[in-house]
Swiss-Prot record:
Catalytic center residues: 91, 163, 267
Subcellular compartments: Secreted, Extracellular space, Extracellular matrix
Gene name per UniProt: Prss36
Name the UniProt record assigns to this protein: Polyserase-2
PANTHER family: POLYSERASE-2 (PTHR24253:SF100), TRANSMEMBRANE PROTEASE SERINE (PTHR24253)
Free-text description of this protein's post-translational modifications in UniProt: The 3 protease domains are not proteolytically cleaved.
Region annotation (Disordered) ranges: 320-340
Pfam families noted in UniProt: Trypsin
Domains: entry comment: The first serine protease domain is catalytically active, whereas the second domain lacks the essential His residue of the catalytic triad at position 387, and the third domain lacks the essential Asp residue of the catalytic triad at position 697. The second and third domains are therefore predicted to be inactive.
Example of a GO MF term: serine-type endopeptidase activity
Presence of the UniProt keyword Kinase in the record: no
GO biological process, one term: proteolysis
């Protein structure tokens, strides 16, 4: 039973009672005392008190509640409706369309605690299981791991209608104070909207949090919702962006605000409502989207519509179930809203009128240590890094917590560190319980936490907030603003090479911000630690956290909070875990496909570009090199502070002055790139390799400051070898040097022999040539010296060469200059693609007469000869 939130991943299995302890007999020595109890006196438990709000039931309060066992453990609940009959949910006994054998099930009656039987408790075998012929399905077309059913193994791609089952016992139950039948409503019985009813069971107390020992029967008060009100709530997207259409015979109970509900393991149990001094079985626990989630009430099978079906199948049983007449028809109260005028409950957490001033910020002070910052996650619990406290004496009398707008400091009752806190950076978390509950208002208030299936959408507005020990932000407030990177960029840029990128709905390994403002020069963030807050529909979630950075740059990757929801929920039993609020996936829908991250080099990721990205949108290493005199050249970012360009475009022949050069990244012509920001840098030096008697074809431009790696400014990988093998290659450039929108042209690299034959006497060492695919020769203009890029399947992009002056087919290779680049740059990303040498044998005698020097002959003739004489390097 739950008054919080739940995800159905654990089936409650309890088997403390030894096998054979009952053997269809009564435990109590006074077993015959109540054999003549009047079965017509249904729905009248022994007088007792009960605790409101989802808690332990008093023994004997709900004497019709039974526990269904299979394989020695509890699987579902049920209700005794006659000495030989139990009513439960059909889905408890159907797996893949097949009904479970009745002889594998048993019914435990008169039990209050699963840890030990009461007097009068006894077990009965099941003789027969009956389900309606119209036990049907409603296809949702989505992953239904969220649905609360009896067992995850029994989940299917649908929600069941007519979800009820009759179980005939092998021998009648022994009636007594703890074993009595419940009344059944007639088909004409009406339960008023807003009626306070009660659900009972031994299910999970929260999502994925089983009922703890001694497994005492739980009860929770729920209010009935009318069909219009319930459908209104379920018509709004919720977990996994699912909506749901109620079927006839379904009944809803709960609250728009959630936090009280049934949970997994309660399936088949009773929802009873009092009417005229009797308790009627109004519904059977069927399913739900999580447990106790906001605007997601529990769904029950209404019993009244099945009066005829029940009577038909129990006919001849004496005594049978009782269907008392309803003394007075109720009228729905004002609580029932109209569907077109439905009001949704809003989150009770994550409200910050002034971002940057966080009403949940908690400052924990321990004698002898600097303050540690965390976040208030409920009215009694603070979440903070465990590393703040692992070496501190646990003398909680001296610990204090300062909360916003609280004149006095709070005292600490206990500390619960994550079990992996000392071994795993991603589990560096601890929960501090306050001695007294805090009245949550505008300040202090709690931050929202994400469920494990929460998918923070790419582009979500996020912000850094203080976390753990460390200094304040060294820069302006704008330095803390960020948008969230999509999963592919995050995991492939900052995660492990070759890892599979989690799909939306699966817990991510990392969360990564893309900062909106560039790093301020001279600042270092090494002494500060941060959490990542992300906003959805005006509500802030604690999305991730990171302790002290390992460098001066702002933190790039955060440990996600999604994976820790079950632990936080289990410890606090009151933290504000909130459903996803934003579902506008926009252009990032391609992330639903399985993707793997390319190889990294020793300096990290390079040459990353999503497969599905349009050619003119994102080439994060492509730079515009603006040279004095309105000349614009193509450049390639090869390290955070270096750009590679063609010498002939940067330096004019005969010029003795060094031009002023500006470099721009993060834009495609006049448009800025998504997932990042435009970057500009000035060039402070131009480096050329030493070439005896020849002007070197490549130049390195040193930038005045480093460029932060991002999807809009990322170094490319460099190929240090010869002609790459098994790679597809393209020339990347601009169709029009005025608008500078990137275009690519597919090419094949020719063998050294063919290249030598086509250009005899004019090839310099380290030069190679390409053949354009049909119709692509004129896609890129050549004055800006475009680069040649290659990529192997699933691999990163690699720079192979830069165009030679005035020629679209000839390129200066990167390989011969690899040593010079490595010595000059230091952080260049080299990735060898294999392949053959660039050098070819000298002498025209090795070239066919018709081919030698035929580079300017008609292309058709040249292409035919090339195809006949030598293979092309495959694209």
């Amino acid at each position: 039973m739950s008054h919080h939130l739940f995800l159905p991943v654990v089936i409650m299995v309890v088997s403390p009672i030894p096998p054979g302890a009952f053997q269809d007999s009564v435990v109590s020595p006074t077993q015959g005392e109540f054999e003549d109890l009047d079965c017509g006196d249904c729905g009248r438990p022994e007088p007792s008190s009960r605790i409101v709000g989802g808690s332990d039931a008093h023994p004997g309060t709900w004497p019709w509640q039974v526990s269904l066992h299979q394989g020695g453990g509890h699987i579902c609940g049920g209700s005794l409706i006659a000495p030989s009959w139990v009513l439960s949910a059909a889905h408890c006994f159907v797996t893949n369309g097949t009904l479970e054998p009745a002889d594998e099930l048993s019914v435990l009656l008169g039990v209050h605690s699963q840890d030990g039987p009461l007097e009068g408790a006894h077990m009965r075998s099941v003789a027969t299981i009956l389900i309606p012929d119209n036990y049907s399905t409603v296809e949702l077309g989505a992953d239904l791991a969220l649905l609360r059913l009896a067992s995850p193994a029994k989940l299917g791609p649908s929600v069941r209608g007519a979800d009820l089952a009759l179980l005939r016992l092998a021998s009648p139950a022994k009636l007594g104070p703890s074993v009595r039948p419940v009344c059944l409503p007639r088909a004409s019985h009406l339960f008023a909207h807003g009626t306070a009813c009660w659900a009972t069971g031994w299910g999970d107390v929260q999502e994925a949090v089983p009922l703890p020992l001694p497994w005492v029967l739980q009860e929770v008060e729920l209010r009935l919702l009318g069909e219009a009100a319930c459908q209104c709530l379920y018509s709004r997207p919720g977990p996994f962006n699912l909506t749901f259409q109620l079927l006839p015979g379904m009944l809803c109970a709960g609250y728009p605000a959630g936090r009280r509900d049934t949970c997994q393991g309660d399936s088949g149990g009773p929802l009873v409502c009092e009417d005229g001094g009797r308790w009627f079985l109004a519904g059977i626990t069927s399913f739900g989207f999580g447990c106790g989630r906001r605007n997601r009430p529990g769904v029950f099978t209404a019993v009244a519509p099945y009066e005829s079906w029940i009577r038909e199948h129990v006919m001849g049983s004496e005594p049978g179930p009782v269907f008392p007449s309803q003394l007075q028809k109720p009228q729905s109260g004002p609580w029932e809203p109209r569907e077109e005028n439905c009001t949704f409950a809003q989150p009770e957490c994550g409200k910050a009128p002034r971002p940057g001033t966080w009403p949940w910020e908690a400052q924990v002070t321990v004698p002898g240590s600097t303050p540690c910052y965390g976040a208030l996650v409920s009215d009694r619990w603070v979440l903070a890094p465990a590393s703040c406290f692992l070496d501190s004496p646990h003398d909680f009398e001296t610990w204090r917590v300062l909360l916003p707008s609280r004149p006095e400091e709070e005292r600490v009752a206990r500390l619960v560190a994550h079990e992996n806190a000392s071994r795993d950076f991603a589990s560096d978390l601890a929960l501090l319980q306050l001695r007294t509950r805090v009245n949550l208002t505008a300040a202090p208030s709690a931050v929202c936490l994400p469920h494990h299936e929460h998918y923070f959408l790419p582009g979500s507005h996020c912000r850094l907030a203080r976390w753990g020990r460390g200094e304040l932000a060294p820069g302006s407030s704008a330095q803390l603003e960020a948008q969230l990177l999509n999963g592919w960029w995050c995991h492939c840029l900052y995660g492990r090479q070759g890892e599979t990128v989690p799909r939306p709905g699966d817990p991510p390994h990392l969360l990564c911000p893309a900062y909106q403002e560039e790093e301020e020069a001279g600042l270092c963030w090494v002494d500060s630690s941060w959490s990542l807050l992300c906003r959805e529909e005006g509500t802030w979630f604690l999305a991730g956290y990171r302790t002290l950075s390992d460098g001066c740059l702002r933190p790039r990757a955060f440990s996600p909070m999604q994976t820790h929801g079950p632990w936080i929920r289990h410890v606090t039993q009151g933290a504000y875990l909130e459903d996803q609020l934003t579902w506008d996936w926009g252009p990032e829908g391609e992330e639903t496909e399985k993707q793997t991250c390319p190889t990294h080099t020793e300096h990290g990721a390079c040459g990353l570009r999503p497969k599905s990205t349009p050619a003119g949108v994102l080439w994060p290493w492509l730079t515009e090199v603006h040279v004095t005199g309105d000349r614009v050249c193509t450049g390639i970012l090869v390290a955070p502070g270096w750009v590679l360009a063609a010498t002939h475009c940067i330096l004019r022949l005969g010029s003795t002055t060094v031009p002023y050069i500006e470099v721009y990244l993060g834009r495609a012509g006049v448009s800025s790139l998504p997932q990042g920001h435009q970057v500009s840098r000035s060039v402070v030096s131009i480096r050329l390799p030493r070439h005896l008697g020849l002007r070197p074809p490549l130049a390195l431009l040193e930038l005045n400051s480093r460029v932060e790696p991002s999807p809009s400014a990322l170094p490319i990988c460099l190929h240090p070898g010869g002609i790459p093998s098994g790679a597809s290659c393209w020339v990347l450039g601009w169709k029009n040097p005025q608008d500078r929108v990137p275009v690519v042209a597919a090419v094949s690299i020719l063998t050294p022999r063919l290249c030598h034959c086509l250009y005899p006497g004019i090839l310099t060492p380290g030069t190679f040539c390409v053949l354009y695919s049909e119709g692509q020769e004129d896609r890129c203009e050549v004055t800006s010296a475009p680069p040649l890029l290659c990529q192997t399947e699933e691999g990163p992009w690699v720079l192979v060469g830069m165009a030679v002056r005035g020629n679209r087919e000839l390129f200066a290779a990167i390989g011969p200059e690899a040593t010079w680049i490595s010595q000059t740059v230091g952080e260049a990303h080299f990735l060898h693609l294999g392949g053959s040498s660039y050098w070819s044998p000298e002498g025209s005698d090795l070239c066919p007469q018709d081919l030698a020097g035929s580079a300017s002959s008609p292309k058709v003739t040249a292409l035919l000869l090339l195809l006949l004489l030598a293979p092309l390097i495959p694209r």
